[in-house]
Amino acid sequence: DHKRVLEGDKGANTGGMGAYSPSRLINPVLEEKILNKIIKPTINALKEMGSNYKGFLYAGLMIIDSEPYLIEYNVRMGDPECQTILPKLKTDLLEIIQACCRGKLENLEIEWYDKKSLCVVLCSKGYPERYDNEVLIENAEKFNLDENDFIYHAGTKKIGNKIYSNGGRVINFVSLSSNFKESRDKIFNHINKLDWSGGFFRKDIGYKVIDE
């Protein structure tokens, strides 16, 4: 994901201004290194400790000279990584969670859509510092989305029939496509339909994988 608030990956750190999947860095060789160097040893250590942990295990990695290094673990999904990845999931998420809880994941074939996914986060002006809440967002419910487009409310609240901002990161726009540029263009088209003077977003999410 893109952590910095400003375009070009500059400015203050945030919870995440957007993300894309798949990563430009991943390949079969690196994936094997991550599994053998980090994931499998972690799972084996949990077993040795007698831990019966079942759930998400989110590894925050840094790749240096094609070698993976573990920065942190979280027992949750990332935000906005979750919004970016889950729309690519063809298998019902509930089936996966149930199989995990019952210890039967090895019997479940998890399938994914072969598409690119891009997420752009619309934020309150001033984020990640001071910002105003309860700023009216016009047209927030007037989208005609196709099956590959998704809108996730985060820092919003509904008063009557109107939607207002209620946090720093406010709305996530996600689009699946055969290429990242098409996903980005569809997202921009949706954002431009909003009437919200109190918001901003990074226009360069995915710039490292989008060939203009």
Predicted regions and their residues:
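Generic C-terminus detector
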Residues: 156-160, 164-212
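Short beta-strand elements
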Residues: 1-2, 59-63, 68-77, 155
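ATP-dependent carboxylate/phosphate-activation module, predominantly the ATP-grasp catalytic core
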Residues: 1-38, 75-88
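Structured core elements
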Residues: 58-60, 69-70, 119-121, 172
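Active-site "cap" helix and flanking loop/linker of ATP-utilizing ligase/carboxylase catalytic domains
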Residues: 32-57, 74-146, 159
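Short beta-strand/turn micro-motifs at beta-sheet edges
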Residues: 6-8, 107-109, 156-163
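A short glycine-rich, hydrophobically flanked beta-strand micro-motif that places a catalytic Asp/Glu
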Residues: 51-65, 203
